Amino acid sequence: MIFPGPKVFIFDMDSTLIHADCDVTWKSFAVRHGLAPESAIAEADKFYEDYKAGCLDPVAFMRFQLAEFIGNTPEEMAEPCRMHFEEFIRENCYAEALQLVKELRERKIPTAILTSTNTEIAAPTAAYFGVDELMGTRLAVENGRFTGTIAGEYAVRAGKIAPARDFVMRHGATLAETAYYGDSTNDLDLLKVVGYPVAANPCPELRRIAEENNWRIIDFK
């Protein structure tokens, strides 16, 4: 499954490596465990549709998405994030994606997940895949507790380019020597600047763009 050329492989997470979107499943988890009202599921679905359409309001979304984190410490949220992975994500990890990352690790090729999902929720998935690094939206902490806001830039669309460039440079490579796997048009900014763009389980619009540009297309199972 490894193709020749790239010195570094970077993967989007939701709907790319896993058959799920953690921003949606997190709210389902929160409702299941009494951390959020039933109405949160429909609201999460609405934000997800906005995300796919490229019109997500990041401020409103983060205010909603991080409600369960506010006032808690990273240590206190580690167990809910682990439980979320076990209940919603583990069984939805694509076997072929797991095998690809395993083969890359065996060949000592640097790998990373770069996701718009916050790194607290994404951490168990990154650990399960065994990638070298997790990059994503970081949460702000003051006095040891989550504030409900983000630290730095929201890792979506063009916000993925800087962390990707930093990662590959630290591994002695350039974006031109990098493969990036993404599933939606929100990944286009990074797909356009890497040397080896891969449309993975692409939405119809990304599949069309990938075909027009002769990009690799893969559908993980």
What do the PLM-derived regions correspond to, one by one?
Residues 1-6, 79, 86-221:
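C-terminal cap/substrate-recognition subdomain and adjoining C-terminal extension
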Residues 60-96:
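Metal-dependent phosphoesterase signature
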Residues 1-56:
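Active-site neighborhood of HAD-like aspartate-dependent phosphohydrolases
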